Amino acid sequence: MTYIQERGSTHVYHVNRMSKEEMDHMISLCVHEQPAYCVAACPFKADTKEMLFYAAKGNFKKALAIYEKITPFPMILCNGCTAPCEEKCRLCELGDGISIREVERAIVRYGEPGKRSSVFRIRKKKKAVIFGSGLFPLFLAGELEKKMYPATIYCQEKDYEAYIAAAAPELLESDRKNEVKRLSSMDLSFEFGCSLDLPFIRAKMKEADVVCASEEVAKKLAPEETADAEIMLREQAGIVSGPVRSVMDAAFAAKRAALTVDLLVQNLSPHSNRGSEGAVTTRLYTNMDGMKGSKKIPCSTDGYSKEEAVEEAKRCIQCHCDECMKSCIYLREYKKHPGLLAREIYNNTQIIMGDHQMNKPMNSCSLCGQCTVTCPNGFDMSQVCKSARENMVSTDKMPLAPHEFALMDMLFSNSEAFLCRPQPGYETCRYVFFPGCQAGAIAPDVVTEAYEDLCRRTEGGVALMLGCCGAISEWAGRYEMTEKVNEQLKQELAKLGDPMIIAGCPSCMKQLKESLGAKVTGIWEILKEIGLPGQAKGLEIPVAIHDACGARGDTQTQDTIRELLADMGCTVVNTEYSRDLSPCCGYGGLTAYANKEMADKMTEKCLERSDSPYITYCMACRDRFVREGRESRHILELLYGINAANMPDISEKRYNRLELKEKLLKNIWNEELMMEKKDYTVAYTEDAISMMDERMILKSDVERVLDRK
């Protein structure tokens, strides 16, 4: 048997199997980090979802801290907020949406303002002046103070309270006092009682780098010009000003104006680098199936009490997308959404020297493709992980250890255990039966019965090919090995006249189609056409079908399996996550070799769906279910009336392949194959066999050591 030569880790091939642009495009498909519908509708991008989360827990201090991020004066903003977020609440589809505005008011009323930290707050050198009073100058003063601009406000009012009253006269006295306290604590300079005539204003303008003003003052300074609504700037006069309209308009205009100030002091165009301002459209997907509507908590004219606000906030369903994570053990175990995990895996491939800490997560994906079906945008984590594995292999950064045993097993199947023969009496054949390496390892008698049946009941000759389709090396990212397997199979098929392949495994069927471009059908399709074997018999109790990963998207195969079971008299129990939504058993993608614990959890997840016996059409699935103590049969076992051995260990699997080859050569082609016989026997305890199976130590490994003595 050929052994795998691992290249030295000091030699690096600069090959990328997936570019950064391709990765960025893939990551953009994941909408997990897209803003919730209410957040996207808010022009200030207030994290309403997070606020409601903390309000529902009664943590009004944390909720207020989130609200304070979007405005320097929360009392004024929440009183004048028109709540565009409320109509976007998904609960509106089922009944009453969340009373977000009233909950926000309760948060501001009952929340404790956070302490202003002076750490890392370095005052900027450029100075700003603000002339006048009203909503826009007030909000702008607060925004500039957040950005640490030394700002001086010149106004006609006599004190802070009058300044607040001029901007928001509708505030209750208690609320006004709170905002006065907030304003007076800011690092701003106020000049109260100013005349604000033109000579005074022009004199003060000379002392500043940036001039801001209320609309009233701006009209005095530049009566012929109006401010650009996008940047809040009278460009010819160089005056930043805003509208005298609603609270929402003034607060939003102040944010735009503050950004304009930032750009002006850096000598940049105020039209550039503005990012996304205002409300946005979200691509978030939230599955509302199973959600129930509810009535909003009634609100008095005084607003919600603390308790009422908590109850109303609890109605929030915290819109998010986790469709892929609901059913994928891999994503749930790593507690990361696909976009983030894909980014970390991609970054892992770019490390030249140092620890590759994402190797195990990269190798733990079963490459089953379930996420492409559950994701509303078809995010394919299997493509990310497979490309990353290939990239790591191509750059000599992928250790052989996680996949070595599986790769050695593939080489064994395609060398010592390999067999390719035409049906006796034929030189070329119409068909070739390719049962797959797992079928020969787990249920060799089924392979024999199936082949003999096909020879008897089909015309044109049926050849037999025992070996591996190359899925093992494909999953491992060892593309060079896959190419060698493809070349070997192509040569053997050519000798047979390039017949149609009858696959006994959906993964083989998929691999052979994609890698060889060959004509492939499933044995189930042939049996549906020629009829059931005489010994076919279903189980007398209800059964559950586990659809193989290789059949994802293959409706014809899924339907045919169900039709054959019905023809055998089986009663099939419908299960959650079946057909294209079916999860992986834990063998796919070589997860069982790279991360056994993860694979075991995948198997358990599969078995949670039903207590009935499982019928599979993938031998690896059948093997893993039996090992978990669940009665499980491959459909070919029912079709040919054979119940294969329950749990062959890794050594028995290899022996079964060799014995199958020997028996078929002898009984069908009258050829003798002498299997090597040792002049000694080794006895193993059950504990030893279990330990060897766990550590993937073959009996032949033990014998090889003994032979050296």
Regions found by a protein language model. Give the residues of each.
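Iron-sulfur-cluster electron-transfer modules
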Residues: A36-V39, K49-D209, K335-A518, R657-K666
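Ferredoxin-type iron-sulfur electron-transfer modules and their immediate structural context
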Residues: M1-F120, K181, L188, A213-S364
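Short, flexible hinge/linker loops that cap or flank conserved catalytic cores
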Residues: H32, F120-R123, M232, G425, ...
